[in-house]
From Swiss-Prot:
HAMAP family cross-referenced by the UniProt entry: RNase_HII_B
Catalytic activities: Endonucleolytic cleavage to 5'-phosphomonoester
Family membership noted in the UniProt record: Belongs to the RNase HII family.
InterPro entries recorded: RNase_HII, RNase_HII/HIII, RNase_HII/HIII_dom, RNaseH-like_sf, RNaseH_sf
Organism: Hydrogenovibrio crunogenus (strain DSM 25203 / XCL-2) (Thiomicrospira crunogena)
Chief location: cytoplasm
Gene designation per UniProt: rnhB
Protein known as: Ribonuclease HII
UniProt keyword Cytoplasm, yes or no: yes
Length: 207
């Protein structure tokens, strides 16, 4: 749905330090839209109050995301599209988005720290940390950037299709979302390989 990479490099040229990268993703569960990953390099001694994005209010997430973008040495936000999700499956599409995020960084990388239990296929030392978004600040920063970016996608979708309520459910398969989907049918961006969407498609084929 979007450019698969958005990145910013704030590191002065000529500095050859290798950096620790934090990576996280958002959007594996929704029925619609991209899966989004972010990779972040923070400066040493960064004093941002970071925590798991899911534990922050939307307004607080947006504020901290702006601060991260201002203070990060480098960051990249990357996506895998609904078509890629349907083609690859959600796990492999998520790994692809993470790989794109890491590859979008423009600084030397020493190690990659990923939230979860699996690392993407990147040519660096990589450690997966279960619940890392609540334990490791640089992963928390990636979680916040990814969450804010995906929520912004859902707001754009809400403005185009307000009858679906994307501003409320963010694309997740809530009761409200399933009711709206049954009522209004599919629009571009739905993940056709996901069971609730498949069910709607099968019902439409019978009409």
């Amino acid at each position: 749905m979007t450019d698969p990479q958005i990145h910013l490099d704030l590191m002065p040229h000529g500095i050859a330090d290798e950096f620790i990268v934090g990576v996280d993703e958002v959007g594996r569960g929704p029925l619609v839209g991209d899966v989004v990953a972010a990779a972040v390099i923070l400066p040493k001694g960064c004093e941002l109050l970071l925590k798991d994005s899911k534990k922050l209010s939307e307004s607080k997430r947006e504020l901290i995301a702006h601060q991260i973008q201002q203070e990060a040495i480098d960051f990249c936000i990357a996506t895998a599209s609904p078509d890629e999700i349907d083609s690859l499956n959600i796990l492999h599409a998520t790994m692809l988005a993470m790989k794109r995020a890491v590859e979008g960084l423009n600084n030397p990388i020493k190690k990659v720290l990923v939230d979860g239990n699996r690392c993407p296929n990147v040519p660096y030392e990589c450690e997966a940390i279960v619940k890392g978004d609540g334990k490791v600040p640089v992963i928390s920063a990636a979680s916040i950037l990814a969450k804010v970016h995906r929520d912004q996608q859902m707001q754009v979708l809400h403005e185009a299709y307000p009858e679906y309520g994307f501003d409320a459910h963010k694309g997740y398969p809530t009761k409200l979302h399933l009711e709206k989907l049954s009522q209004h049918g599919l629009i571009p961006g739905y993940r056709r390989s996901f069971k609730p969407v498949k069910n709607i498609l099968q019902l439409l084929e019978k009409i």
